[in-house]
């Protein structure tokens, strides 16, 4: 509801150069990176339910904090806290699904969960845009109340799915770091993560920068802009299954470069457009790339990983977003201040082309299980 417009809020509240405003996302990405690694051990040690509740209540407090923040350091602290609390709920839900669903049904369970989440993503920006175009404070309060209410529901009605085993050894953070060290020695995995991270830098520009870019330079208000992220969510809901049925007929290393090629096109469309419809078209183009690449890349990593380490490899693969978030928005802010408002999008297009080339370099690597059909 609020997240797509957060850069607008901080920009208008702080009245600082764009580079300073976008650098706040670095606080979020750094803490989110650390929390994503630690969350797995936390949910295994303390239980899924408790960690999820902490994440939801913590996020609620952060949203309330935005109402009172007036200085850069206060926003930085809140962004850091947001990055710490956010992954706790996500990792907890993933663990609960794994606990409740047998291995042969997990792919479908995660797919249904992703579709359900995107229903919220579709409705949230519309409601948020209507409220935030009038007052951000009410929007923050609604978001905080919703998160706290959901946390209370989980606390009261969700059962703990972690089975306590007296003699079983639980994975520690040290174990996860050791597996991460092993994964980083896998050159194909590292190349894959690097390729995906470059592509995700383009995505961060669309999700973090586009809203403030559209409002400050073209007067597109939150209530109208909200249809752009909503379009992304609706496309995921209605097109993901059909597109995956097509792409799974081909090797992942041939599919991923095709999907990645949509991202630089989206960047160029933003750069040359100056209207709502141009920005909407750019989001549609990028979303097609997401629909093609996201599930395919996940399958590639899963097939690349040792069978007993697939979950952790996928977890490490998810860190690509936080790396991209630490680079993309801050670089965009610097380019905006030092060159022009269009510079970040042309730079994003170049990075997108590099990601396509990087994905093409993976074609000589084809894990034995990558073909899904």
Region locations from a protein language model:
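Helix-loop boundary and gating motifs at the non-cytosolic
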Residues: 1-29, 190-195, 199-228
């Amino acid at each position: 509801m609020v997240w797509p417009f957060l850069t607008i809020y901080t920009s208008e509240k702080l009245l600082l150069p764009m580079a300073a405003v976008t650098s706040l996302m670095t606080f979020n990405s750094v803490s989110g990176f650390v929390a994503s690694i630690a969350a797995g051990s936390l949910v295994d040690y303390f239980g899924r339910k408790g960690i999820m509740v902490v994440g939801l209540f913590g996020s609620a407090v952060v949203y309330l904090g935005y109402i009172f923040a007036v200085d850069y350091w206060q926003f930085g602290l809140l962004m850091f806290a947001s990055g710490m609390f956010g992954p706790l709920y996500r990792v907890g839900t993933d663990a609960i699904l794994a606990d409740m669903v047998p291995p042969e049904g997990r792919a479908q369970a995660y797919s249904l969960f992703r579709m359900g989440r995107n229903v919220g993503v579709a409705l949230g920006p519309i409601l948020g845009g209507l409220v935030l175009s009038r007052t951000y404070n009410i929007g923050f309060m609604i978001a905080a109340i919703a998160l706290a209410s959901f946390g209370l529901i989980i606390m009261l009605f969700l059962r703990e799915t972690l089975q306590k085993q007296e003699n079983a050894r639980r994975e520690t953070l040290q174990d996860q770091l050791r597996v991460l060290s092993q994964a980083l020695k896998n050159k194909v995995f590292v190349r894959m993560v690097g390729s995906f991270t470059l592509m995700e830098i383009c995505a961060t520009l669309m999700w973090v920068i586009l809203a403030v870019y559209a409002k400050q330079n073209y007067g597109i208000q939150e209530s109208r802009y909200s249809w752009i992220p909503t379009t992304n969510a609706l496309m995921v809901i209605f097109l993901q299954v059909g597109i995956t049925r097509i792409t799974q007929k081909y090797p992942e290393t041939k599919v991923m470069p095709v999907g990645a090629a949509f991202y630089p096109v989206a960047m160029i469309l933003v750069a040359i457009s100056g209207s709502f419809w141009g920005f909407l078209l750019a989001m549609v183009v990028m979303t097609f790339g997401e629909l093609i690449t996201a599930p395919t890349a996940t399958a590639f990593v899963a097939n690349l990983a040792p069978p007993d380490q697939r979950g952790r490899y996928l977890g490490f693969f998810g860190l690509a977003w936080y790396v991209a978030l630490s680079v993309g928005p801050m670089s965009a802010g610097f380019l905006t201040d030092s060159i022009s408002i269009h510079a970040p999008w042309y730079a994003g297009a170049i990075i997108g082309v590099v990601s396509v080339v990087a994905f093409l370099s993976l074609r000589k690597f084809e894990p034995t299980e990558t073909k899904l059909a």
